[in-house]
Amino acid sequence: MKSSKVAAKEGRKSYKVADLKEFWSGQKYIELLDPNTLACEDWKDILWQLANSGAYVDFNQGVDIRLMTEKKAEIIQKMRTKHIHFAWDSYKDKNIIVPKLKMFKDITNWERSKVTVYVLCGFDTTMEENLERIQIIRDLNFNPYVTLYDSQHIERGSELKRLQRWVNNKWVFWKCGSFDEYMKM
């Protein structure tokens, strides 16, 4: 599921430790800090509690889209949420992730104003694979957001840094049709 470093640090699974009513007292916002809520055995109960709360739910971590099902998407669609973030860390997961993103879009009808997909670049991908993932996300009308692996050791002005600058500046990204077009500016 997660990369081995993240899995060793955070684990591969979430566990429900309490019902929402045990620590939530009607605030307008609920912020989820767990990217693996969908991996929890009690996911359905947790998602329904969040949906039924009426509060805005903030999925502020990159939710593992590989764990998305139609039922999970249907419940998430019923939540009051301003935004959800998914993670696409490895190009190798393309055949799993792309159908899941399409299914999520078909069920929720959410677009880039509500969906961001984190794209990890510079770990085990080529520039062509990075651009392909970004284009797939763009074609779905979701917002890609480039994160760089070991970014402090990537040279300033490098192709990866310029890719990150283009994609993460949403105004420029949606105005420039391609990375090549951006590079000519």
Where are the model-predicted features located?
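Generic secondary-structure transition motif, activating predominantly at the C-termini of alpha-helices
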Residues: A51-G54, R80, K105, V167-W171
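Hydrophobic positions in alpha-helices of CheY-like receiver
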Residues: L50, L101-T108, I137
